[in-house]
Swiss-Prot record:
Monomer. PANTHER family: RIBOSOMAL RNA SMALL SUBUNIT METHYLTRANSFERASE C. Pfam families: MTS, MTS_N. Belongs to the methyltransferase superfamily. RsmC family. This is Ribosomal RNA small subunit methyltransferase C. It comes from Salmonella heidelberg (strain SL476). The gene is rsmC. InterPro entries: DNA_methylase_N6_adenine_CS (IPR002052), Mtase_sm_N (IPR013675), rRNA_ssu_MeTfrase_C (IPR023543), RsmC/RlmG (IPR046977), SAM-dependent_MTases_sf (IPR029063), Small_mtfrase_dom (IPR007848). It is found in: Cytoplasm. It comes from the Bacteria. It catalyses: guanosine(1207) in 16S rRNA + S-adenosyl-L-methionine = N(2)-methylguanosine(1207) in 16S rRNA + S-adenosyl-L-homocysteine + H(+). Specifically methylates the guanine in position 1207 of 16S rRNA in the 30S particle. GO terms for molecular function: 16S rRNA (guanine(1207)-N(2))-methyltransferase activity; nucleic acid binding. The keyword NAD does not apply.
Length: 342
């Protein structure tokens, strides 16, 4: 994190207004402005583990990663600066949670790119903190209001679920494929064979659907699931529990918190971070897999057909094969051999 996002650059146009403010930053925190902003006090709350990693180096205990904010996260703050994400239900979940903890009268700022749908903030907060647009620049909007009424927030009411092949999939706002199985994961699932054994790592696990489906017809498999997203981690735990399955689930920035080696790594890696296209996670996944696969272990991923993963797979493992494809997606497989670059 170094260069500021367009949303942060819009905020910096108003930096003089915040010198006496005690600010809680939340939402889609794509840079380190919360650590560098000149104000009386700065805290941050994030649901994204990689954002917490970057900010905690400078902010220490003043930034927290979790599914929901708690009273201690907003303590003494008189201002909320919320970075609008591209996912509207995620924004609603986070704003209702945070504003339920803040006292009436606090300043509420919402900033985001126009293409992210930041305009939705006005109707969303109309009953709680009526907003006015105070700036428009860098294809972003900045909105301000004061909290007039605290919303009610209950985590239980935000859970949703759907069924696939007799499995119950539990989801939360902000989890990939919240409303049903995506086409890419469906294609990857079609390649998984029954009676798989050994240790399997599911990177970017989302709601846990890949692992749950695999374990349902491979009872001897030992599952480990990880994701950068706090909602995804909680959803995966809930999915496993709902189906009587066992597995270790934790937050990790690709392999950052992963220990040991596995017989198979499966993933539907993201290629967006917020509004930005980013292949970083997938590249880290492919190049790092050699340090987390047993000899003969395999990496199996699904990706949009236009993404340049074959080149990275060949550079890292020496070869790859396409084991399933549609017009839009391909499932790539490669194996840990002596020629892999460790």
């Amino acid at each position: 994190m170094s260069a500021f996002t367009p949303a942060s650059e819009v905020l910096l146009r108003h930096s003089d207004d915040f010198e006496q403010s005690r600010i809680l930053f939340a939402g889609d925190l794509q840079d380190d402005l919360p650590a560098r902003f000149e104000c009386a006090a700065s805290r941050a709350h994030t649901q994204q583990f990689h954002h917490w990693q970057a900010l905690s180096r400078q902010m220490g205990e003043n930034v927290r990663f979790s599914l929901v904010a708690q009273a201690s996260d907003v303590a003494d703050c008189d201002t909320l600066i919320y970075y609008w994400p591209k996912n509207k239900p995620e924004a609603q979940f986070q704003l209702m949670n945070i504003l339920s903890l803040m006292p009436v009268g606090v300043d509420v700022f919402v900033v985001g790119e126009n293409r992210s749908g930041v305009r939705s903030a006005e109707p969303m907060l109309a009953d709680y903190a009526p907003l006015n647009k105070v700036d428009s620049a860098r294809r972003c909007g900045l909105y301000h209001g004061r909290l007039e009424k605290q919303p009610q927030f209950s985590l239980e009411s935000w859970w949703a679920e759907y069924s696939i092949d007799g499995l119950t999939i539990k989801t939360l706002p902000g989890v990939f494929s919240r409303d049903g199985l995506d086409v890419g994961s469906q294609l990857l699932l079609s390649t998984l064979t029954p009676h798989t054994k050994g240790k399997v790592l599911d990177v970017g696990c989302g709601a846990g659907v890949l692992s749950a489906a695999l374990a349902s017809h491979s009872p001897k498999v030992r599952l480990t699931l990880c994701d950068v997203s706090a909602p995804a981690v909680e959803a995966s735990r809930a999915t496993l529990a709902a189906n009587g399955l066992e597995g270790e689930v934790f937050a990790s920035n690709v392999f950052s918190e992963v220990k040991g080696r596995f017989d198979m790594i499966i993933s539907n890696p993201p290629f967006h971070d917020g509004m930005q296209t980013s292949l970083d996670a997938a590249q880290t996944l492919i190049r790092g897999a050699v340090r987390h696969l047993n000899s003969g272990g395999e990496l199996r991923i699904v990706a949009n057909a236009f993404l340049p993963y074959p080149k990275i797979l060949d550079e890292t493992f020496g070869f790859h094969e396409v084991i399933a494809q549609t017009g839009r997606f391909k499932v790539y497989r490669t194996v840990m051999t002596r020629q892999a670059k460790k």
